[in-house]
């Protein structure tokens, strides 16, 4: 196993906009896509239907040079879709049930994770709404022992307090937004008006290496296990299209930084910069390597 091959687990789907345009998405897919652009060749574990959308995903991954070893085909369930509406530049999601990514089968990837070493396992909270995919993730964690980057993506109604708490307890690094931080605080019985102090409490409760909190146009901050606080300044978006996938770009650069031993302040600044670039395109993925070169030139 190559030293810097992260394992990315979870949904791949199509974001369908009001004008009926559709673009590939899903936080784990977006993160894997960006990491491929950054040269890490991630091992992406997901599931698509045996349908036209599934074929489009497979072809898109091939064209980008991504590995297909962990992508399963499903004859019974469709490739995931999400209806996206944009209000004041912010996306709202209608996430459909019983999608292929809900049924990721561990037996299909068992030989790819047993006795294998991965430096990092990324996952979110949506793809584990269903017991089958949830159990597959559990087995991956057991078999690999990889350190976990948890991306909190609260999407109604596909979450529960128990689900979020269990994933936090197994995580090493966590990324969430300010609203999700407040929700975690409610779940854990924490309270504080100051976001920084609240994040420090959550970091301590779950023994995290660090917690990243994104603040939209106000930037982001990291608090680590030693209560060291780093803040980033916001980056202007010249031509805002939408914010779909901006957080996923942020996560990908954060993971790249972790695997390259960047200081927390460096992670923040570069992740915020890259997320701002995502806000200038429709959808969540880029086909232009120049965007990634901005990060790689300083790696």
Tell what function each PLM region has.
Residues 6, 113-114, 166-167, 204:
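Structural alpha-helical scaffold elements that stabilize or flank donor/cofactor-binding regions
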Residues 1-67, 240:
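Glycine-rich phosphate/adenosyl-contacting loop at the front of the ribokinase-like
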Residues 1-4, 192-299:
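Conserved phosphate-binding/catalytic region of the ribokinase-like
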Residues 42-44, 148, 211:
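Hydrophobic/aromatic residues located in beta-strands of well-ordered beta-sheets
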Residues 41-125, 296-299:
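Conserved N-terminal subdomain of the carbohydrate kinase-like
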Residues 120, 124-197, 219:
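Conserved beta-alpha-beta core of the PfkB/ribokinase-like small-molecule kinase fold
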